[in-house]
């Protein structure tokens, strides 16, 4: 799977590192670092290759974290915030997949 190496979010240029190996935490699939404007996405989880759909949902998830931080809202903090981000990520992915005409106009 190919992901863009750069994404602009809220006027900020983010680097996307893919594939990234999380040596510090094996249970992590993605990470957003607002201090370095970096999004890291793993292509493996517990030594198993991840599906492209899962990788895309993770990218959306980390983009939502970046939007939340760059807008200064910080609405999605803590475990409850993660649940909301996860639900939004899956929902946005489903809408984009189920409605390809939306992707054409973007």
Region locations from a protein language model:
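Active-site recognition of the HExxH zinc-binding catalytic motif
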Residues: 57-69
